[in-house]
């Protein structure tokens, strides 16, 4: 009798350009884990039905991307602490008792990538640009690294204020209006998607301290719009979100398989794939 190969997937809409199957196939090869990982388009109004069917047909776990992370949060029968704080789920796993646990590995992926680049977060002055789901998902893991301060700025100030209140118990968190952000920061994280449309947040270029690091969660061929601007105005280091993508995937893989794959080689392969080399 042939053994059933464990099935995993990523659900989103659109999903055609997802790098997750590429990443997880390499993880599986690296760790000698027999599994299949596919990209699945869920209808905009049919995410829950699609995921239920996937698990009913024997699926073991899945990643969830836009626009379904909040729905996945509602769907999960149990949540990790970091998923509860993120208010969104990017990883689902079916447990032996049939329950579906929801996790959010985005923040862990970001922190892992920053630390791999030797970015010092302990004692740092961190600025997070944006106050949407991407920002909310990474605040707790960033605060766990014990920065001196974490400032959130956003076009709609009230959203930044809401996040500052929500995470106040976990460290020194403040919200600032964009036009009042003039002091220097050690680590500047752009959680907005502005770079995808070639736009920049309305911020002063005085935010980059000596030896500062710019991190844009978006990625593409070459530097993002935000990182180009950061380097022009004094950022000593600039990284895009491709390493975060690999890091959050490694964290998901760990949740599913109990093994942590190595990220460095996979990131190199993914970068080559992205550049069309």
Swiss-Prot record:
Pathway noted in the entry: Metabolic intermediate biosynthesis; chorismate biosynthesis; chorismate from D-erythrose 4-phosphate and phosphoenolpyruvate: step 4/7
InterPro entries referenced in this protein's UniProt entry, alphabetically: Aminoacid_DH-like_N_sf, NAD(P)-bd_dom_sf, SDH_C, Shikimate_DH, Shikimate_DH-bd_N, Shikimate_DH_fam, Shikm_DH/Glu-tRNA_Rdtase
EC class (word): oxidoreductase
Active site: 69 (proton acceptor)
Catalytic activity: shikimate + NADP(+) = 3-dehydroshikimate + NADPH + H(+)
Coiled coil: none
Ligand binding (shikimate): 18-20, 65, 90, 106, 219
Domain of life, source organism: Bacteria
Gene3D superfamilies in the cross-refs: Leucine Dehydrogenase, chain A, domain 1, NAD(P)-binding Rossmann-like Domain
Any GO molecular function: shikimate 3-dehydrogenase (NADP+) activity
GO cellular component, as recorded: cytosol
Binding site for NADP(+): 81, 130-134, 154-159, 217, 241
Any single biological process term in GO: chorismate biosynthetic process
One Pfam family in the UniProt entry: Shikimate_dh_N
Assembly notes: Homodimer.
Record's function text: Involved in the biosynthesis of the chorismate, which leads to the biosynthesis of aromatic amino acids. Catalyzes the reversible NADPH linked reduction of 3-dehydroshikimate (DHSA) to yield shikimate (SA).
UniProt protein name: Shikimate dehydrogenase (NADP(+))
Source organism (scientific name): Vibrio vulnificus (strain YJ016)
């Amino acid at each position: 009798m042939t053994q059933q190969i464990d099935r995993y997937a990523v659900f989103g809409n659109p999903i055609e350009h997802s790098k997750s199957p590429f990443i997880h196939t390499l993880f599986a090869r690296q760790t000698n884990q027999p599994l299949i990982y596919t990209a699945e388009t869920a209808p905009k109004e049919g995410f829950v039905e699609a995921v239920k069917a996937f698990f009913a047909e024997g699926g073991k776990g899945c990643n969830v991307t836009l626009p379904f992370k909040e729905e996945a949060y509602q769907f999960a029968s149990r949540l990790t602490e970091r998923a509860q704080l993120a208010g969104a789920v990017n990883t689902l796993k079916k447990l032996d008792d049939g329950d579906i646990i929801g996790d959010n590995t985005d923040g862990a992926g970001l922190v892992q990538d920053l630390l791999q680049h030797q970015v010092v977060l302990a004692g740092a002055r961190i600025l997070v640009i944006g106050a949407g789901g991407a920002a909310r998902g990474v605040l707790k893991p960033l605060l766990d690294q014990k920065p001196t301060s974490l400032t959130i700025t956003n076009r709609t100030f009230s959203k930044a204020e809401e996040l500052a209140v929500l995470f106040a118990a976990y460290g020194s968190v403040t919200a600032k209006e964009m036009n009042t952000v003039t002091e220097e920061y050690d680590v500047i994280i752009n959680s907005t998607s502005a770079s995808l449309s070639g736009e920049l947040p309305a911020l002063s270029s005085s935010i980059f301290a000596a030896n500062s690091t710019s991190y844009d969660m978006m990625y593409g061929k070459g530097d993002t719009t935000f990182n180009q601007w950061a380097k022009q105005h004094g950022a000593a280091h600039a990284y895009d979100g491709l390493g975060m993508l690999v890091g959050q995937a490694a964290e998901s893989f760990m949740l599913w398989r109990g093994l942590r794959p190595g990220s460095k080689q996979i990131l190199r392969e993914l970068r080559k794939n992205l550049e069309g080399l």
